UniProtKB/Swiss-Prot annotation:
Domain of life: Eukaryota
Binding site for Mg(2+): 485, 487, 489
Family: Belongs to the RNA polymerase beta' chain family. RpoC1 subfamily.
Pfam family, one: RNA_pol_Rpb1_1
Annotated protein name in UniProt: DNA-directed RNA polymerase subunit beta'
Cofactor: Mg(2+); Zn(2+)
Signal peptide start and end residues: none
InterPro entries assigned to the protein according to its UniProt record, in alphabetical order: DNA-dir_RpoC_beta_prime (IPR045867), RNA_pol_asu (IPR000722), RNA_pol_N (IPR006592), RNA_pol_Rpb1_1 (IPR007080), RNA_pol_Rpb1_3_sf (IPR042102), RNA_pol_Rpb1_clamp_domain (IPR044893), RNApol_RpoC1 (IPR034678)
PANTHER family: DNA-DIRECTED RNA POLYMERASE, DNA-DIRECTED RNA POLYMERASE SUBUNIT BETA
């Protein structure tokens, strides 16, 4: 489907029988209408040609070879002077053979058949619409019991018995005895309704607007006051909400409920269910062909029974209708009703649902997962030194992705006379190649995608940089948007080629522009997993307490009893530092550990200090100054009790974390001031 903006899209939904017929029907020049598949045959065993009106019929689906009919006649495709467009003998149209990839056929079912997706899948749409238990509807569809229905509001033979099951076994045998075969057929059509035709009649009688109004009025009813009754009311209201949403969807999309019961069964184009000849002359066929054959066989049998209904017992007709329903169920979803159908080698047939669902299905493997040019794939690893909008590309991947641009750069700078010379320089890994590659990558973003792409943040743009190794380096903060982690996940990298694609990547898709979740608006670039553990280790410190650190001999490994003459650090149980640079320098020289408690001179508000907290210890100096030691800070006072210095008790990890936060806030303010 192509919308008004020329965007190609695919939509799956219910269609009317008229639409199915329009997809498959063709009118020949002689007035004959083709499109219905009536025979369960594929290819003739002698001529190896498709059987007429079979599953591979050239009249219905188009010629196998372009411009050549079944008789062997040839016409030039697209030549307006060539007449006629159809072969007069075999009625095959002279068109391109690619028509067999999209030209459909149909099977006219002898009885209505419910679509098993809408009956058996949970929630059951048919059960929701009819407001009846699923088990009850299944028994009705598969002819296990029947409805007694009044005609034109007149009393029936069954006295409005309603839904009845053959619990009284005499009902099965008394009705045929009271009526002749012909009379039983008339009686059943007038008095009894069973099979999918009953479901279709009830769905056709539904008024979606009435369902909305009645469900809404029932939903507005208040509680009864009884606890058990209120629980039933809540469950009923949940069901009514689902029913109203379903009715709104059908109204909005112009879908009729009776379309969930099939009268015409679409037949896939033959190229989507091929028969391939392998070594030894053997044929390998798609499982769907065998399932289609089973449907046609049973449908033709039912058609024959109905044409000779005057001599056919009604029970036999009902049994055959059940077989047709089961055959269509197996075609659409094998095994949904229990034991799946198997071939002679005890292998389960792949139904239509098996073909399209899952990772190896038609959608994810063929439509969504197609291989494209200018793309690569590799395992992701953490790159903590990268900026948020950058990613690290291995040299091997980068030179392949940007090889065309590198060749153009070599030729423009007169470093290579032609493409062959440029490729040889690339193969030899000359230094100039990597310089040109870095220039190319500096102005060219790349797209990273992690399957499955479930929302917008599943694919984001990054500025690439060259890294060693064979893995893609990624900033850990962008992993949540991709739902990725570093336990072996793989990502695909794509190169946007057109100027429009590059502009879209830069303006809309860069990772530092997608910091909020598009669904709920919460921040999505938040620390998770390894980062949380790292922040915990960085800021945990030694939590045994100030007294334990001072008097526990096992905790003194971080600060030995010796003077550091080169920095003139005065040792007092825990080291003192005038600024954070000295503390980090001592850590880099391995004089203290990351979680070593230390005293850092700090500018602290005096109002915070002027509290009623009593000091743990007070150390007096010979000159009259003294130190008041509290739990998390230390005050140096003069003889006049004036505050000279204030130290806070911290660790190198806390200092590093604080500096990173401070730099980030300052960068944010600079960016805001630059933007205004």
């Amino acid at each position: 489907m192509i919308d008004q903006y020329k965007h190609q899209q695919l939509r799956i939904g219910l269609v009317s029988p008229q639409q199915i017929s329009a997809w498959a029907t063709k009118i020949l020049p002689n007035g004959e209408i083709v499109g219905e598949v009536t025979k369960p045959y594929t290819f003739h065993y002698k001529t190896n040609k498709p059987e007429k009106d079979g599953l591979f019929c050239e009249r219905i689906f188009g010629p196998i070879k372009s411009g050549i009919c079944a008789c062997g006649n040839f016409r030039i495709i697209g030549d307006e002077t060539e007449e006629p467009k159809f072969c007069e003998q075999c009625a095959v149209e002279f068109v391109d053979s690619r028509i067999r990839r999209y030209q459909m056929g149909y099977i006219k079912l002898a009885c209505p058949v419910t679509h098993v997706w809408y009956l058996k899948r949970l929630p059951s749409y048919i059960a929701n619409f009819l407001d009846k238990p699923l088990k009850e509807l299944e028994g009705l569809v598969y002819c296990d019991f029947a409805f007694a229905r009044p005609i034109a509001k007149k009393p029936t033979f069954l006295r409005l018995r309603g839904l009845f099951e053959y619990e009284i076994q005499s009902w099965k045998y008394s009705i045929p005895l009271f009526f002749t075969t012909q009379g039983f057929d008339t009686f059943r059509n007038r008095e009894i309704s069973t099979g999918a035709s009953t479901i279709r009649e009830q769905l056709a009688d539904l008024d979606l607007r009435t369902i909305l109004d009645s469900s809404l009025s029932e939903w507005k009813e208040g509680p009864t006051g009884n606890e058990w009754e209120d629980r039933k009311v809540r469950r009923r209201k949940d069901f009514l909400v689902r029913r109203m949403e379903l009715a709104k969807h059908f109204i909005r999309t112009n879908i009729e409920p009776e379309w969930m019961v099939l009268c015409l069964l679409p037949v896939l184009p033959p190229e989507l269910r091929p028969i391939i000849q392998i070594d030894g002359g053997k044929l390998m066929s798609s499982d769907i062909n065998e399932l289609y054959r089973r449907v046609i066989y049973r449908n033709n049998t039912l058609t024959d029974l109905l044409t000779t209904s005057r001599s056919t017992p009604g029970e036999l007709v009902m049994c055959q209708e059940k077989l047709v329903q089961e055959a269509v169920d197996t075609l659409l979803d094998n095994g949904i009703r229990g034991q799946p159908m198997r071939d002679g080698h005890n292998k389960v047939y792949k139904s239509f649902s098996d073909v399209i669902e899952g990772k190896e299905g038609r959608f994810r493997e063929t439509l969504l997962g197609k291989r494209v040019d200018y793309s690569g794939r590799s395992v992701i690893v953490v790159g903590p030194s990268l900026s948020l909008h950058r990613c690290g590309l291995p040299r091997e991947i980068a030179i392949e992705l940007f090889q065309t641009f590198v060749i153009r750069g070599l030729i423009r700078q007169d470093l290579a006379s032609n493409i062959g010379v440029a490729k040889s320089k690339i193969r030899e890994n000359e230094p100039i190649v990597w310089e040109i590659l870095q220039e190319v990558m500096r102005g060219h973003p790349v797209l990273l995608n992690r399957a499955p792409t479930l929302h917008r943040l599943g694919i984001q743009a990054f500025q690439p940089t060259l890294v060693e190794g064979r893995a893609i380096c990624l900033h850990p903060l962008v992993c949540k948007g991709f739902n990725a982690d570093f336990d072996g996940d793989q990502m695909a990298v794509h190169v946007p080629l057109s100027l429009e694609a590059q502009a879209e990547a830069r303006l809309l898709m860069f990772s530092h522009m997608n910091l909020l979740s598009p669904a709920i608006g919460d921040p999505i670039s938040v620390p998770t997993q390894d980062m949380l553990i790292g922040l915990y280790v960085l800021t945990s410190g030694n939590r045994r307490g100030i007294c334990a650190n001072r008097y526990n001999p096992w905790s003194r490994k971080n600060y030995k009893n010796e003077k550091w003459n080169d920095h003139n650090y005065k040792y007092m149980k825990e080291p003192f530092f005038c600024n954070s640079y000295d503390a980090i320098g001592a850590y880099r020289q391995k004089r203290i550990n990351l979680d070593s408690p230390l005293w850092l001179r700090w500018q602290l508000d005096h109002r915070v200090v002027a509290s009623r907290e009593a000091p743990i210890e007070v150390h007096y100096e010979s000159l009259g100054t003294y130190h008041e030691i509290y739990g998390n800070y230390l005050i140096v006072r003069s003889v006049k009790k004036e505050i000279i210095f204030i130290y806070i008790r911290t660790t190198v990890g806390h200092i590093s974390f604080y500096r990173e936060i401070e730099e980030a806030i300052q960068g944010f303010y600079r960016a805001c001031s630059y933007g205004t």
